[in-house]
Amino acid sequence: ETKQTFDLREGIESTVLILQHRLKANERRPAIEVVTDYGNIPHIACFPGQLNQVFMNILANAVDVLDETSSHQSYRDLEVKSQSITIRTRVEKNWVEVAISDNGPGIPDEVKAKIFDHLFTTKDIGQGTGLGLAIARQIVEEKHGGTLTVQSALGQGTEFCIRLPIGDD
């Protein structure tokens, strides 16, 4: 399997499109807003299908968290402070960065410490496998020579940052 030149923005957009039905308003909450701030990033050599899986895992988790949070808030409160996912891309030296953040409740430190562990999940039995973020990190680090990190504080939301090298290796 060889790497292909790929526009990450296209991968992100197609993933958001797949999740569109989950972002729409429902009886429990208004629509989740997706805000994009695409910096001018180059196409990179990568395995597009694998990176799309990474985007899907992170974005689907963000939707899960916001869905879960909305069950503890009134529709009106959610209209006032809308739930959102922000996707930013930029070039930082020889890296392309994709940052995906939500304005959910944030992650406690003890969960953050284990978030990329194989089989670790905070979801109810039958809801999560504990594989999504472990696989996402493996794809980014082992297959692409990049990094996948998380920053979060309780009450401050969560941001996952994917950094991928620009170049051919």
Each language-model region and where it sits:
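Conserved catalytic submotifs in the C-terminal HATPase_c
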Residues: 28-43
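A conserved beta-strand-to-alpha-helix junction within the catalytic ATP-binding
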Residues: 4-17, 35
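Conserved micro-motifs of the catalytic ATP-binding
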Residues: 1, 43-46, 122
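Short helix N-cap motif at coil->helix boundaries in the Bergerat
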Residues: 8, 106-114, 128
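Glycine-rich ATP-binding loops of the HATPase_c
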Residues: 144-151
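Short alpha-helical Gxxx[C/S/T] motif in the catalytic ATP-binding
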Residues: 132, 136-137
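Detector for a conserved hydrophobic position within an alpha-helical segment of the HATPase_c
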Residues: 140-141
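ATP-lid-like helix-loop hinge signature
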Residues: 2-4, 24-31, 63-96
